[in-house]
Every structure is written in C-alpha cells, then in structure tokens.
Amino acid sequence: MFYWLIELSNTFPGFGAFRTFLNVFRYITFRTGGAVVTGALFVFLFGPWIIDHLRIRQGKGQPIRTDGPQSHLAKKGTPTMGGLMILSGLTVGTVLWANPLNPYVWIVLAVTLGFGFVGFYDDYLKVTKQTTTGFGSKLRLLIEAAIALVACYALVRLNRDPASTALTIPFLKDTVLHFGWFFVVFGAFVIVGAGNAVNLTDGLDGLAIVPVMIATASFAMIAYLAGNAVFADYLQIKYVAGTGELAVLCGALLGAGLGFLWFNAPPASIFMGDTGSLALGGMLGAIAVAVKHEIVLAVIGGLFVLEAVSVIVQVVSFKLTGKRIFRMAPIHHHFEQLGWTEPQIVIRFWIISVMLALAGLSTLKLR
C-alpha cells in the first residue's frame, strides 16, 4: 500500500515537494524495515486480546501428550493457535509495505496462508476433541501437496528461463541439475517437507520460532541478492527478477515472530500450534524454491531437517527391528529424556541454527 505513495508523487504534481522523501519507498531495504516494525507492533498490540480470546474459546487449551516428558503436563491449559497472531502480523506488514503488483509476494503469501489454514483446522480438531491427533496425516499431506504443486507451477510459469526448472548445487560453480517440468514435483516436495519439518520442531517453548526467524532473516538476504542483477552476477548466483520483494515479506514475518516470542517465551502464554508451524515452514520452502536456493534451505534449516529425520529414523527402526534409536522422537524430546532442561535444549538449538545459517550464507560466495 505504501509503495503506491511514490506512484502518487509521479501522477499528481502536488506531491512533487515530497518526492525526495517519498523516494525512500522505492527501496526494498526501507520497506523491509517498515514491515519488521509493523509486524512486531501489530502482534504486541493485539497479541494480549488474541490470547485472551483463544483461552476463553478453547477452555482446556492444547492437549498434552501423556506419554511425553512429565514436565510438559504443567503446560496443560495453555491456548494454542498462536500462529494466528503471526499470520495476522505477517499479512498486515506485507500488504502495507510490499509491492502489490509483485506476483512472487502473492504466491508465497498464498502458500503461507494455505498451510496456515490446514494447520488451523488440525488445531481446531485437537482442541475440540481434546486429542493430540487432528485429522488424518494422509489427507493433510494431500492438501499440502496440492497447494504446493499449484504454487510451484505458478513459479515456473512466471520465469520462462530454462534455468527456472534446474536445481543449483551450492559450492560448485555453474553446476545445475535440469529437472524440466519434474521440478514442479520437486519444488512441492521442498515446500511440504519444510512445512512438516518446522511442525515437528515446534515442541518446546520458543524452540521453533527463533530458528524460523534466523532462517527467514537469511532468506531475506538471499532474496534481496537474487533479485538484484548486479549482486547476483557478482556472487554468480541465479538472478530471478522480482524476488527481491520477498525480503519485505520476510521482514513482516521477522517482526511478527519477535512479537510472538514475547508471549511464547517460557513459560509460554500461548503455543504456535500447527497453525503457525506449518505456515512458516511452508513459507520458507516457497521462498527457497522461488529464489532457486532449495539445497541452501536444507543447510540453513538444518535443525528442522534433523528433527524430521529423527522421526523418520525412529519410525523405520521400530517397524523393521522393533527397537527405537532415540529415547523419544523428535530429537529434542530425546535430549529431555537424557536430563537436559528445556532452556538448555532451546538455547543450544538456537546456537546450532545460527551456525547453520552462517554456513548456508557462505555458499553464496564459496563457489
């Protein structure tokens, strides 16, 4: 919305006196900063009202697994669906500060809200039925896959460059794997995988939101560089015109995430729920596909990959041998069973996320 101010200054001569000031709205960096502040302020201002409303409507709050760590039973009654706070702040910040004519913004936002709706319905069933399982995992994955496939098809159609359906290999200069139209399926796998990996990570207060913000900040930088022809040429990365605007969307999420963390810090006043975790993971996946840095997402989001792999390994091992590799999965629960306190796990996982983000960003230069 604010992006139109510079257009008004060109259309109506009366705005000419303010043209120097309004010119700052041309800059993605300025609008990204504005989106950060807007997202944070929205959640700070409306967060308490949303939490009170959800607490009243949900009554008993999110069900707690009885087979999990006993310390989690103290969290009984905490409302869930906190992702609504994040998605609201994200949407407001994006609508106000992003270029409304940029298709990449709307595609990624559609994936985010679509995954958020799937997570919301899952949370709704858990709360109303007071069970730790929502609707069937197969149906949920099918809906997520449908959303992701449509989004990836749209992304490929936007960029007719043959490289748009190729996979770039980090660290290796000019090395790509050409997938053709199969890239649509691969991209959908990345988006769905990212959504569910973040969902599995969201098991402790503050555990998921900070790594998500770290990954988002990293991809804000990548999107800005990939969307700038000069920087992309200098770094020898794929130039994707228009994707720089995704930095504004990332900024809105950073601000909304900071606001949510205020209320999610231990002891949490609200849980993100599937509403937030699926949406944020799906958003990261969609941005990675849009800017052609899918493998880099696996590095920067390595913590999410670790959580997802721990569940897969646990399930496969138990089905094949009847034995479990970890005391409990996802892996953050394994460390709880080993005696680590919740703050120890959360902060150490944050540190790992920072190191992985630095490793992922290093791929931009090391080629």
Curated annotation (Swiss-Prot):
GO molecular function, one term: phospho-N-acetylmuramoyl-pentapeptide-transferase activity
Cell division listed as a keyword: yes
Membrane topology: Multi-pass membrane protein
Keyword terms: Cell cycle, Cell division, Cell inner membrane, Cell membrane, Cell shape, Cell wall biogenesis/degradation, Magnesium, Membrane, Metal-binding, Peptidoglycan synthesis, Transferase, Transmembrane, Transmembrane helix
Cofactor(s) of this protein: Mg(2+)
Involved pathway(s): Cell wall biogenesis; peptidoglycan biosynthesis
Gene Ontology terms: biological process: cell division; cell wall macromolecule biosynthetic process; cell wall organization; peptidoglycan biosynthetic process; regulation of cell shape
One GO CC term, this protein: plasma membrane
TM spans (from-to): 34-54, 78-98, 101-121, 135-155, 175-195, 206-226, 246-266, 270-290, 295-315, 344-364
This enzyme's EC code(s): 2.7.8.13
EC supergroup of this enzyme: transferase
The keyword Ribonucleoprotein is assigned to this record: no
Cell compartment(s), UniProt: Cell inner membrane
Reactions the enzyme catalyzes: UDP-N-acetyl-alpha-D-muramoyl-L-alanyl-gamma-D-glutamyl-meso-2,6-diaminopimeloyl-D-alanyl-D-alanine + di-trans,octa-cis-undecaprenyl phosphate = di-trans,octa-cis-undecaprenyl diphospho-N-acetyl-alpha-D-muramoyl-L-alanyl-D-glutamyl-meso-2,6-diaminopimeloyl-D-alanyl-D-alanine + UMP
Primary location: membrane
Entries under HAMAP family matching the protein: MraY (MF_00038)
Family in the record: Belongs to the glycosyltransferase 4 family. MraY subfamily.
PANTHER family in UniProt: PHOSPHO-N-ACETYLMURAMOYL-PENTAPEPTIDE-TRANSFERASE (PTHR22926), PHOSPHO-N-ACETYLMURAMOYL-PENTAPEPTIDE-TRANSFERASE HOMOLOG (PTHR22926:SF5)
Primary role: Catalyzes the initial step of the lipid cycle reactions in the biosynthesis of the cell wall peptidoglycan: transfers peptidoglycan precursor phospho-MurNAc-pentapeptide from UDP-MurNAc-pentapeptide onto the lipid carrier undecaprenyl phosphate, yielding undecaprenyl-pyrophosphoryl-MurNAc-pentapeptide, known as lipid I.
Protein name listed in UniProt: Phospho-N-acetylmuramoyl-pentapeptide-transferase
Gene field: mraY
